[in-house]
Structures are given as structure tokens and as C-alpha cells.
């Protein structure tokens, strides 16, 4: 970790486009990338690979502290690569089984503390783009640029619907909207690190904006702060 390396945090609710935007900005600047939302899935997957029980807080904490992972920003229109211990696990960590495991490990306080430290270790020169829900409020409160990206629940459901339809999945727009609203409720009301913009965050509503328009706004904020 290099505490002097600049960090740009991009937080927001599920489906806001923060992952896409974070990857594109990281690729454009040549900076490191952190997808914090994937870390619990990665830990659950890694624990299963090493035969560690998902209720063993002590061993999980040790795994979390030494999680060997790299996020590689993808070209526009493609998914980012997630490399765990030298293996591309971008797709395998997205299964329902891994997701259930991620929920289990995320409930363990010592694991959360260990992953907080691990996230901060991603801060390296020339800089870091950190994507998540509490990057600007908890993980990198000193970041020189914090972005809170949102969109209406209806628009986020529509985007997710089109994404899943494109993969050939049979989904209902109304059920996706219900899921997103429920997720928003959980994220904003939870006791630990609730989803909310940092006091000094730039808030961007992307409901009516294209990805390029969002990128242009962030580029402008980067230039104003002389971050590159």
C-alpha cells in the first residue's frame, strides 16, 4: 500500500453503472482497480477451494488478510477480469452457490475487519479506482475525489433486464424492480456502513445520462483536482 497514491471512489446502489464506469476510468488512467463487492465472493470461493468451513471465522480471517487477487479493467463492452491466485475466476464466482457463501462470510465481524485492511492495500501508485458501496465513507475517507453514482430504481431494473435478456435468461422486469428496491432498503438501513454518499462526494444521477456523459463529468472533476 502507498498512502500517498491518489484514490477515486465510485459508490452507489446496485445497477447504477458504477462497476462499468470504474473499469473504464481505471483503464483510461492506467490506474489500479478495486471491485470491493467481489471480495466476499472471492473469499467464499477461495475458502471452498482450500477446504475452509464458511463458519470458521479464524481461518477465514487469515484467508481474507492474504487474499491474492487482481482486478483487470476490461475494454469497453467487455467484463473485467478477476484473477485469484493466478487463475481467472471472473465467471465462476458469480454462481448462486458462491453468492450464498459470500453472504455467510460477510456476516462475520472479524472477516469484515480483515477485508477492510486488505482493501486499503490496493492503494498503489499511480492511483486506485475503488468501486463499491462504502469506499468513500469507510474505506478511503481521505480520497481526493468521491463519486456517488445513482439512477432511479426503474432505470436500474431496466438495465439489468436488458443485460440478462442479452445472456438469454428468462427474467421479469417487475421482479427485478422488486429485487432492486429490496436491496436498496437493506443497503441503506443496515447498521454497519450503510449505503449513503460521503458528505464531500460528487453526486451523479445517471438515469438520463449515457456512460460517456458520466465519464465526461468524472474526467472534468479529475482535471479540476489535478489528479493526473
From Swiss-Prot:
GO molecular function list: ATP binding; CMP kinase activity; dCMP kinase activity
UniProt entry tagged with the keyword Lyase: no
Enzyme class name: transferase
SUPFAM superfamilies hit by this protein: P-loop containing nucleoside triphosphate hydrolases
Catalysed reactions listed for this entry: CMP + ATP = CDP + ADP; dCMP + ATP = dCDP + ADP
Keywords for this protein: ATP-binding, Cytoplasm, Kinase, Nucleotide-binding, Transferase
Record InterPro entries: Cytidylate_kin (IPR003136), Cytidylate_kinase_dom (IPR011994), P-loop_NTPase (IPR027417)
UniProt-listed GO biological process terms: nucleobase-containing small molecule interconversion; pyrimidine nucleotide metabolic process
EC number in record: 2.7.4.25
Leader sequence segment: none
Keyword DNA repair: no
Residues noted as binding ATP in the record, renumbered to the chain: 12-20
Family membership: Belongs to the cytidylate kinase family. Type 1 subfamily.
Localisation per UniProt entry: Cytoplasm
Organism name: Pseudomonas putida (strain ATCC 47054 / DSM 6125 / CFBP 8728 / NCIMB 11950 / KT2440)
Name listed for the protein in its UniProt record: Cytidylate kinase
GO cellular component assignments: cytosol
Pfam families, A to Z: Cytidylate_kin
Amino acid at each position: 500500500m502507498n498512502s500517498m497514491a491518489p484514490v477515486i471512489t465510485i459508490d452507489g446502489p446496485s445497477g447504477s453503472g458504477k462497476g462499468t464506469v470504474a473499469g473504464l476510468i481505471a483503464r483510461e488512467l492506467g490506474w489500479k482497480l478495486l471491485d470491493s463487492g467481489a471480495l466476499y465472493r472471492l473469499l467464499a470461493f477461495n475458502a471452498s477451494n482450500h477446504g475452509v468451513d464458511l463458519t470458521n471465522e479464524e481461518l477465514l480471517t487469515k484467508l481474507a488478510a492474504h487474499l491474492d487477487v487482481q482486478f483487470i479493467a476490461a475494454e469497453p463492452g467487455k467484463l473485467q477480469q478477476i484473477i485469484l491466485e493466478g487463475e481467472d475466476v471472473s465467471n465462476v464466482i458469480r454462481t448462486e452457490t458462491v453468492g450464498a457463501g459470500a453472504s455467510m462470510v460477510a456476516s462475520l465481524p472479524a472477516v469484515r475487519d480483515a477485508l477492510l485492511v486488505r482493501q486499503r492495500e490496493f492503494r498503489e501508485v499511480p492511483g486506485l479506482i475503488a468501486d463499491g458501496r462504502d469506499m468513500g465513507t469507510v474505506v478511503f475517507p481521505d480520497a481526493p475525489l468521491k463519486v456517488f453514482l445513482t439512477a432511479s430504481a426503474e432505470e436500474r431494473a431496466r438495465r439489468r433486464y436488458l443485460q440478462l435478456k442479452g445472456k438469454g435468461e428468462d427474467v421479469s422486469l417487475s421482479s427485478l424492480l422488486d429485487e432492486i428496491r429490496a436491496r436498496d432498503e437493506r443497503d441503506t438501513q443496515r447498521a454497519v456502513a450503510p449505503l449513503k454518499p460521503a458528505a464531500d462526494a460528487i453526486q451523479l444521477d445517471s438515469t438520463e445520462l449515457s456512460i460517456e456523459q458520466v465519464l465526461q463529468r468524472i474526467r472534468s472533476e479529475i482535471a479540476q483536482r489535478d489528479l493526473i
